[in-house]
Structure formats: structure tokens, C-alpha cells
Amino acid sequence: MNVTRISDAPEYQAPNHHDMTCLRLQGREAGPAEQLWLGLSVIAPGGHTGLDPSPMEKHYVVIEGELTLTGEVPGQSAQSVVLRPLDSCRFAPGEKRQLVNHSNSVAKVLLAMPFDPPAAK
């Protein structure tokens, strides 16, 4: 068993993330993991990510506050949705994704992401 207390969770920097604090809860520098890692992002009012693709599948669960998530699959129009506590969203590998905190309160979101992209089919 590997326990990471929130007070001990290492902070990490993610590219194109603005007005956000990103903490590693499990995996990578937070401890052993074989297939995925968990992170917690604390997003200030007005904080956001870029609308960027990733080769990794990503799963988000809003823990606190409200976030607007936008996804865009190549060749399709972008789709946005507002998530509130315990709402979740999955982004497919290669799908562009953006998180924006349009509210006046801090938002917290849990991220689960594999270490490696899916194998070629």
C-alpha cells in the first residue's frame, strides 16, 4: 500500500496550465504505480488549460467548484460542458481538451491518466 497525504503530495508543472496548482497523488514522484497516475488540480478563478491534444486517455472528476470542459475531436466541432462536484468526463487519446474555471471560486479536479499511450491497433 502506498499512502500520499495531501500535505505531502508533490507539486508538478504541466505545460500550458495557467493559474493552477497541480499535485501528484499517486504514481511518478508520489510513489509506485504500474499503469496510471492520479493528480489533483486546484484551479483559481479564471484559471485554465490550453485546448491541446494528448496521446493519453484522461479521466477527470470534479471534486469542488465548477469547471467548463471542452473537447474537440479532429474533424468535428468542439463540445463544451459544465461539470459540478462528482461529475466526470473522459477524453479519448488524441482528443483536444481544455478546462476553464469561469466561476469566482476555486475548483478542484481529480485526474487519472495512464503512463503510456494505447498500443497501436
Give short role names for the model-derived ranges.
Residues 1-35, 120-121:
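A short, N-terminal "cap"/entry segment at the start of jelly-roll beta-barrel domains
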